[in-house]
């Protein structure tokens, strides 16, 4: 993977790695379930439920990459920017900047 010094450059490549609609939808579903796990953990005062957050988000993302996009996730090379890109992509879809 190419080296990136700025997030905006990385995000442009990130979107290309997430061009398949099903892959993108699985990422968004994983994020929604992760937020649900966070809400549940807070509401039930159950810190163990927090372990479901990365399982939901990463698990569905890896399925999307493996079976639909057929590539390797950018988060493996850029863990912080890959995670940030995931949430920025979710925001962009919710705001209508990216196609669902």
Label the model's feature ranges:
Residues 2-14, 70-100:
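Membrane-proximal soluble regions of multi-pass membrane proteins
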Residues 8-28:
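Membrane interfacial helix-start motif at the N-side
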Residues 23-26, 48-53, 81:
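Alpha-helical transmembrane segments of integral membrane proteins
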Residues 26-40:
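Core segments of transmembrane alpha-helices
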Residues 38-41, 64-65, 93:
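Structural signal for membrane-spanning alpha-helices in multi-pass inner-membrane proteins
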Residues 39-50:
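Helix-coil boundary and interhelical linker segments in multi-pass alpha-helical membrane proteins
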Residues 55-69:
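Transmembrane alpha-helical segments that form the membrane-embedded catalytic/substrate-channel core
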């Amino acid at each position: 993977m190419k080296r990136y010094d700025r997030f905006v450059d990385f995000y442009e490549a990130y979107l290309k790695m997430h061009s398949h609609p099903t892959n993108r939808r699985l990422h968004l579903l994983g994020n929604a379930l992760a937020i649900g796990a966070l809400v549940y953990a807070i509401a039930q005062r159950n810190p163990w439920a927090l372990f479901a957050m990365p399982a939901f988000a990463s698990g569905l993302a890896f399925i999307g990459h493996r079976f639909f996009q057929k590539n390797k996730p950018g988060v493996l090379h850029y863990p912080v920017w890959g995670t940030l890109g995931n949430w920025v992509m979710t925001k962009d879809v919710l705001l209508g900047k990216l196609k669902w």
